[in-house]
Amino acid sequence: MFSSSSELQARRKTLSILQDEAKRVLEAARELSETFPALLKNDQEALNKYAESIMKAEDDVENLRRMLTRELAELGPMVINREDVLRAAYDIEEIASYISSAAFRLAGFKLKDFKKTPLLKDLGSVIDLAVEMVYRLNEVVRALTINPSLAIDLTQSIQKIERQVDDQYRALTLKLLSELDSFKEVLVLKDIIERVENMADQCLKAADSITIIALSL
């Protein structure tokens, strides 16, 4: 049997690493939000810088997830919900992968190949919503060690934003087909939009995983 204080220390240690992981993902998301303005300014140097920085963040997130895996293995049954914690860590890591993927595609986007279209503004709006979801997710993870009930409540805001992303994704996809003449333009923009939408979906999945942890605390 483990003492309650030992269990509490073990829980705090693992949740601290999970919080570091979520924070690093948020930093990457914020850089993604800076990538789009750089695209509109046709600032290729800035685009490349952001893409490289986000790739570094993706590596950092993977390392933190590996650290958490080792920690959970060492603590063993002392952490009763370790499978749930590990699942959440993998879900958060996957968000970083989608952010990196979207940033890479934006960095390779050739603005000069596109006619002026309000669709780019709509794309920026979807990106902003997805980044806001990552911010809210970070708040949820932080709340785990302070007030698990609050963490559960905060996930509702993530669900609401995800529905907005879905609505804008569908509307933007229809606009692509009706407003763009070039099949190449449609494919490129649709690819970017899908990556951002996948990022939002993954945020919701991670929030669900964290809710399971909160229910056990």
Regions found by a protein language model. Give the residues of each.
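Cytosolic, long alpha-helical scaffolding segments
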Residues: 1-217
